[in-house]
Regions:
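Metabolite-binding pocket within alpha/beta catalytic cores that recognizes anionic/polar moieties
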Residues: 1-109
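Generic non-transmembrane alpha-helical segments
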Residues: 120-130, 168, 206-213
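A C-terminal functional module that forms or caps the active site or interfaces directly
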Residues: 137-187, 191
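Hydrophobic/aromatic beta-strand patches that form the interior of the parallel beta-sheet core
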Residues: 35, 61, 78, 131-136, ...
């Protein structure tokens, strides 16, 4: 099976890349490929779409760090069950209105379901053994401007690329996972309080476990 490991930056995947270079895979076994998609939705969307057209993967795993709305999540690794475009809309005097509330998009038009980009591969999510949380994708976060999160579930994970993964893989019908290690609270710009190193170590550890499990996994795991 062709496995595509997607990350926004080298930093998030470097340790796993080194491990892969020193790991021996069987001739007919897992065939992993790394792709650095770049920061943000546009770069990620282009890189992922282009790679799928060049060589369709059996599974895409997007791996990276993220922020969380709950302090207890810091240092943990989770799988993302659904994504929302948290700041795509208009800030009115009365508050933020997303594209669905504005009537610009149907909240149930595929690949959206009630305004969310769900990962339908529930068996795959369960197989990870990780807590499954909701994700929100943003273009900008300011410590004093968290209105977008007030409209979402209490326990959410923030990134700048997650929705691009979900949207493209849903449209292309490619199985996918989004794995996030929580390094900080959303809106906290004081990096002295971030647990970046710990998050990266935890992310690498879970990715290695996941790849080793995939080497012996039945491909029926990738069915909806």
């Amino acid at each position: 099976m062709h496995l595509l490991l997607l990350s926004a930056t080298d930093l998030e995947i470097n340790e796993t890349a080194t491990w892969l270079n020193n790991h021996t895979f069987g001739l007919n076994a897992l065939k992993p490929k790394l792709l650095i998609g770049g920061i943000g939705q546009l770069q990620t969307a282009y890189a992922l779409q282009n790679q799928i057209r060049l060589e369709r993967p059996g599974l895409v795993i997007q791996a990276g760090i993220g922020g969380a709305t709950e302090k207890e999540e810091i240092g943990k690794v989770c799988a993302i069950g659904s994504e929302q475009l948290a700041d795509l809309g208009v800030m009115e005097k009365t508050g933020f209105m997303n594209i669905f509330e504005m009537g610009l998009e149907n909240r149930d038009r595929f690949p959206f379901r009630d305004g969310k980009l769900d990962n339908p591969y529930r068996s795959l999510l369960k197989w990870t053994g990780l807590p499954v949380l909701d994700g929100v994708t943003v273009n900008e976060i300011r410590s004093s401007d968290l209105e977008v999160f007030q409209r979402n579930p209490l326990r959410v994970v923030e990134s700048m690329e997650g929705a691009a993964l979900h949207y493209i893989c849903l449209m292309e019908k490619v199985p996918f996972l989004q794995i996030r290690a929580i390094s900080n609270m959303t809106g906290d710009r004081d990096k002295s309080r971030w647990k970046l190193r710990e998050a990266l170590k935890s992310l690498h550890r879970e990715l290695v476990v996941m790849i080793q499990k995939l080497e012996i996994a039945d491909e029926t795991l990738l069915r909806i």
